[in-house]
């Protein structure tokens, strides 16, 4: 959900009102193809769905079903922002609402979404921010399993 929840601040629906919210993403104007970013361990299956609630309620939407392969390591935030940039570069109907940047509140991610820096730069930035958080949170963690890290 860390990345999927950001779709609510765009003109893409995260499948609210379907049997697979946050697994389906799309809009009536999306024409799915094989150019959408697809990290290792993920299948981006073309699909259509009709939400019974939320944005595009009752309208047929086309897009993708995000399927994780068994044992896949998945970084929802990074994949979501990568997909957002893809939609902004391929669909004039795609909009990032002002509330999106308020929720992101990170200048490096904002610059990536605006097309000003590469994915490698934002990926390293997020990795660094996660490591800083882990160091701060370490004294409060009650378990030994390491939180997910970007490899």
What are these regions (language model features)?
Residues 1-22, 26:
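A surface/extracellular/periplasmic glyco- and lipid-processing/surface-interacting theme
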Residues 18-127:
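Conserved functional hotspot residues or short segments at active or partner-binding sites
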Residues 113-151:
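C-terminal regions of mature proteins
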